[in-house]
Each structure stands twice: as structure tokens, then as C-alpha cells.
Amino acid sequence: MQALQTFNFKELPVRTVEIENEPYFVGKDIAEILGYARADNAIRNHVDSEDKLTHQFSASGQNRNMIIINESGLYSLIF
């Protein structure tokens, strides 16, 4: 399991992970930065299924499932 890396975009955190040499972004982080009121709805309505994965991460001793999106999914949320 890859570890999350956190970057800041205009002082807001963006969590990323690399899977098979491709960057993926935590969808919730991107949707919130872009101003979507409901991140889960934005990802469901705008990102194609082939551009998102549910990935399990371990944080603070707990496993959490997060929706991560690839670069194409990122552009789907932007445009």
C-alpha cells in the first residue's frame, strides 16, 4: 500500500498517491478546493468510473477507504 503524500495548493492540502507510476489525487480534497458543496456528488456526477478508484489507506491506526482520481478525473472536475 502506497503512503499518501500531502502538497499544498494555495495553502490548502492536496493528498496524492502514486499507483503504477501514475499520480492519483484524493477526490474530496480536489472537489473542496474547487468549491463543490458536496464532494461525493461532484465526483459521482463528473468523474468517469475509469478515472476513479476506491483505495484503502491506513491513518492513525485505522483503515479508511477514499476515492482517488487520476489526472483525467481531475480535469473532469475542473472543466
Residue ranges with predicted function:
Residues 1-79:
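An anion-engaging/catalytic patch
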